[in-house]
Amino acid sequence: MRHLGRFASLGLVASFATIVVAVTEVHSSPRGDRGRSTERGAALVPQVRSLLAAKCFACHGPDEATRQAGLRLDTIEGQRADLGDGFVSIVPGDAEASEVFARVLEEDPDLRMPPPEAHPRGLSSDEVDLLRTWIEAGAPWGAHWAFLPPSSESTAHSLRETIDLEIAERLHLAGLEPHGRAEAAAQLRRVSLDLIGLPPSAEEVEAFLADPSDAAYGAAVDRLLASPRFGERWARWWLDLARYADSKGYEKDDGRTVWPYRDWVIRAFNEDMPLDRFAMEQLAGDLLPDATDETRLATSFHRQTMNNDEGGTSDEEFRVAAVVDRVNTTMEVFQGLTAACAQCHTHKFDPITHEEYFRLFAIFNQTADADTPDEKPTLAMKVDLAWLDAPLEAKVPVLERVAEEARRETRILAGGSFLSPTELVEPGVPAVLLADRIGVSMPRDRLELAAFLFAAENPLTARVLANRIWAELFGTGIVETVEDFGIQGSPPSHPELLDALANALREQGWSLKRFLREVVTSET
């Protein structure tokens, strides 16, 4: 398998080429051909959305508390708003009649937008051209791409064929030629590092080179996927996402017993536990109807938060900090969203309100753990280690739901401070994730949230995980900002390929090994 490191900027080249083509075609299109013009303008929406998010949304975006002059530019209704006195924010098809565009060109610094004190350089000439072209093309808008369901168009091609076709097409558009196939020894070394994190032994290289058959590479891939080192290599990837640490952090940074969770992750990957079950046990293993010590151990995913053993600290302050960390980690890992920005105020760029953040918080707020030196609740486990004469009892911090009579009420914390509780809220998720698509009811606990995240209609989870795996293999994600699928994140360099990967991951039963085999046996 050849890595795309040398083509890391290919997606950007292709995206830029798309923009140039779209801009050129719009300017050369007949003025009356509104249908074609709008269709071409739609190609510019991701770039326009990113531009407005970076330069305008802080004052004219989702956050009502900081919105200036009543102007909102993150919705089509706000963009088309009548500002009074004959002024309209954006007039589709007529940039010169659009007040937003006029303010961008305004020479008076007191009237120019964005304000010089916020953006001293204003918009570049390329950004002005992009805005003008988009408005002249009808100012199309619509939901952010990541909140739309992946394309489900059927294809006669396998995933590996789809990968090769998509990459070859973009190389052609960019005027690039693919490199020839790597030498056999290099192929084996690369796939070994990808799948088990170790180079092949001299004996393995010799055996591979001695077999010239077409089946040799596939057999090597199968051997690597079956290796116990596979789980160790991919556990390193996951444990980084889970913020795993063998110490508690803060000033004392004492050690803690969490390695059984690490070993659980390794076992799960070696056994090819489906990723939806893998996630469900970590998010809510204690709530499963058939909960076992193993599923409870998996909830240590939530207990990787820092723990403060210093005297004189507020237990409630650090308990709240731990719940906040769980909300932020869950949304970032599985949804690719920077929900943390809504902890103190409504998100400045993405459609997540301050209230919706604390509805998520309420889902994680019903746990029995606290910021204490013993890190209760813990799970006592007998562990047999080869170098010990007797089994070792490990007490692993896990998550446990509080008793019904001890359930906490959840209030919005003004400014994110545990000292400033305000209105009561019920458990839930941001409305943008519902959008009348998800085939489950509003989640009210961690188990329902896990089901919600992996519902077939959820537009984010499969894309985010497929992109994370792709980035782990190739060094760069199809969405370069692997942690941010929101409005300020990078648009996908190959959107059709990303959707094909997401659909395949789900259709293959969330099997990591099957997914990896398809990718590493492609010509890419």
Protein language model regions, located:
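Short pre-active-site segment immediately N-terminal to the catalytic Zn-binding motif
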Residues: A322-E332, A456-T461
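Juxtamembrane loop-transmembrane helix junctions in multi-pass integral membrane proteins
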Residues: H3, R319-R326, M442
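N-terminal export/targeting leaders of redox proteins
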Residues: M1-A42, L224, W238, A245, ...
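Primarily short, surface-exposed interaction patches in extracytoplasmic proteins
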Residues: G122, H157-R189, D194, L198-R229, ...
